[in-house]
Amino acid sequence: MLSYLIGCAFGRWDIRYATGEQAAPELPDPFAPLPVCPPGQLQNAQGLPARPEDVPATYPITIQWDGIIADDPTHPVDIERCVREVIEVIWKDRANAIEQEACEILGVNSLRDYFRRPAGFFADHLKRYSKSRRQAPTYWPLSTASGSFTLWIYYHRLDDQTLYKCIQQFIDPKLADVEKELTHLRAVLAANEGGAKERKRLEELETLRRELIELRTELELWAPKWKPNLNDGVLITAAPLWKLFHLPKWQKDLKACWQELEKGDYDWSHLAYTLWPDRVREKCKSDRSLAIAHGLEDLCDVKAPEKKVKKAKKKAVVELDLEGGNE
């Protein structure tokens, strides 16, 4: 359920189906071509994923079109606040009871507790979006070392500006707030006006400040180089950011994928060409399939195989002696 609620907040799913404002879509003809969007997705008039201009001003919730939501109670785009908005629109006066029941079923004290634990929402989400060896989580948590601050990003909205937006719209404002509170607490303690509570809060903020700077540094490192292309798949696209995921199994898989990328095992990917263009271009000279994948056939020294002309098979002609002369 919570995966659906987050999807509504990101604009993946159309909440009006859940409220009854729109009738459930008809079952498609089993022999018809597959639609671009699955049933229930927020779509435009052409049946494509909706964009901001496609959604009316009367739409029931605020959609996070940038594809970024913070786990931060002080931020207006906070994951608990966004999910609660969806719950309130769907269940109205039963919203609090539904939220409490969900927390009891999940065995957590609050929705935030469930989202913040590495073995909570993301572990369940990863399991649900994995099949055989394919792992394709849609909602990614990029976290500080302790998990005290997390940015949830929506895979299908990734672009080359996503990491810059994470820094400018979320991390920098948070750092400014932390610095302001630190300055105040230091002044209070310097004047001998504070006690154990203030000293503990000071330690917490100093740790948070250090971790936010580490998170910012890692994102700043990748922001100019990371050009996500969804055709590469989830694992390859997320691999450079492996340090920011804290579910052990997922981090291990991403790190292994990153090491394989560095070795050149996935040079067919757009990400590999973005990060190591010279290496990929050199390989394209002797690998025609790789050259075709990157649109670099002009670099390839291997000629395309000539098409073989199929010769028409001669039909065997059987002559029957109707006169009986071949007895």
Question: What name fits each language-model region?
Answer:
Residues 2-327:
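Terminal accessory regions of large proteins
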